[in-house]
Amino acid sequence: WEKGYPVSPTDIRDTMDYIGSFSLYAYEDELRQGFLTVEGGHRIGIAGKTVIEGEKVKGISHISCINVRVAHEKKGCADRVMPYLWEDGRFLHTLIVSAPGCGKTTMLRDIIRQISDGESPYPGLTVGVVDERSEIAGCYLGVAQNDVGIRTDVLDCCPKAEGMMML
């Protein structure tokens, strides 16, 4: 296992059938983006031959790679920054910047949860999340699998521009 496991096309097909509940067509929109979110908020990334139509990805065929990204939360990771995000009882406009893989999404998720739930001395507020790639709430069948707070509304797999107008 240290070197990996060589998979056959049958292994990949069987795995895709299983994670798609034997109805992959129902996940066409997600698969077009190169991944599928499963129960627990885990993401299954795929690679293969992209099918292009009008300069847009219509789908992915001949899937040759499956990458499982296990979702995890780190509640409390935003504790140290929360005092800097409030001024005069109001939440400040905030931009989170860092290199890839340093925890921006994890911190954002915890900030959302704390704002939504209300963490002393801050009041709970209504939060709207446009989760374009199911990375923040990790929705499965429309239900957030990650704790994003009790006052948070999530638009899952929604383009940001459209979602901002909907909220």
Regions found by a protein language model. Name each.
Residues 60, 110, 142-145:
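Short, glycine/charged-enriched secondary-structure capping and boundary segments
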Residues 77-130:
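P-loop NTPase nucleotide-binding module
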Residues 1-40:
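N-terminal accessory targeting/assembly segments
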Residues 17-20, 24, 51, 86, ...:
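Signal for well-folded cores of large energy- and translation-related assemblies
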Residues 116-161, 165:
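P-loop NTPase switch/communication element
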Residues 24-91:
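P-loop NTP-binding catalytic core
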Residues 52, 75, 101-102, 133-137, ...:
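Short, catalytically relevant binding-site loops at active-site mouths
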Residues 8-15, 42, 92, 107, ...:
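Helical mechanochemical/support elements of P-loop NTPase systems and associated helical scaffolds
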